[in-house]
Amino acid sequence: MEIILLDRVHGLGSLGDKVRVKSGYARNYLIPNGKATEAIPSKIAEFEARRKELEEKQAQRLAASAQRAESLNGKILTVFAKAGDEGKLFGSVGTQQIVAAAEQQGLQLERQEVMMPHGTIRELGEYVVDLKLYGDIEAQVTVRVVVAE
């Protein structure tokens, strides 16, 4: 199925690209989430009419994400967790706990933005965590896992 992207989609393309994807991916994810529209003549004309508006919206999101990256970069987030004598956690620290720690400091962060390619944190200590905010805009925060008393 051919579609026109209304937003940047990782692995597919950016705004205005005409790409071919599987029908299920388009119908069940891209189109309902407003990331794409079918590439039929009427929809193409509608997209071209809205193109400038969508490009401005994307530019605003990029600028806002760059500003957020600047404010988040280098921050230290403290997460409290129960741990044994050897520093092993009872459970683990994942994206949800990192987002909660950011919110406690007044920082806005979403679970999808936290990248943990090596899995959850299972020991006390400091860890550098990558954040993928929007498109190519990334930031890094330090997560300090300490014992909860």
From Swiss-Prot:
UniProt keyword rRNA-binding present: yes
Coiled coil: none
InterPro entries, sorted: Ribosomal_bL9, Ribosomal_bL9/RNase_H1_N, Ribosomal_bL9_bac/chp, Ribosomal_bL9_C, Ribosomal_bL9_C_sf, Ribosomal_bL9_N, Ribosomal_bL9_N_sf
Molecular function GO terms recorded: rRNA binding; structural constituent of ribosome
Gene Ontology cellular component list: ribonucleoprotein complex; ribosome
UniProt entry keywords in alphabetical sequence: Ribonucleoprotein, Ribosomal protein, RNA-binding, rRNA-binding
UniProt keyword rRNA-binding present: yes
HAMAP family registered for this protein in UniProt: Ribosomal_bL9
Job of this protein: Binds to the 23S rRNA.
Protein name as it appears in the record: Large ribosomal subunit protein bL9
